Amino acid sequence: MKVVTFGEIMLRLKTPENLRIMQSDGFEASYGGAEANVAVSLAMYEDKCAFVSKVPNNPVGMSALSEVRHYGVNTDYLVRGGDRLGIYFFEKGSDIRNTNVVYDRAFSAFSLSQPSEYHWENILEPGDVFYFSGVTPAVSKYVEDTVRSALKY
């Protein structure tokens, strides 16, 4: 049995300290996304897991892929294509100001995923756990259709 997670990995740009985006002249870059984070957490406990997504076939997409692989997550079923990785900007709250997150994921490689790009019959085996967050099918109609196709297996 393995856990298969399906979702978008994004470039996370965080303002330094507690600065707002408008106050910052730079960002700290990392990668994140609910399903990627779950896969990494499971891999750290040496559980068998795979992360399924779509990233652009460029240095940013390959860097995101490398980050997940670094923790021992299987990325064999990851699709490469599209033009851009989704981005989110993170402002840490302080005192009375709440944390703020701004998403820029329209037309990301993942949001344009097509069901035909994923061969679920080869990815999911009987007894596997399939994990996706509630946001995933809401990313786009294409992704919703892709989730529906996976659920048939």
Report the location of each language-model feature.
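Ribokinase/PfkB-type carbohydrate-kinase core domain
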Residues: M1-V4, R69, R97-Y153
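Glycine-rich phosphate/adenosyl-contacting loop at the front of the ribokinase-like
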Residues: M1-V73, F110-S116
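Glycine-rich beta-alpha junction loops
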Residues: I9, G82, F107
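A common structural microfeature
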Residues: K48-C49, R84-I87, N100
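Short beta->alpha junction loops/turns
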Residues: K54-N57, G82, T136
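A glycine-rich helix N-cap at a beta->alpha junction
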Residues: L65-L85, S94
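C-terminal domain-closing interface element
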Residues: Y88-N98
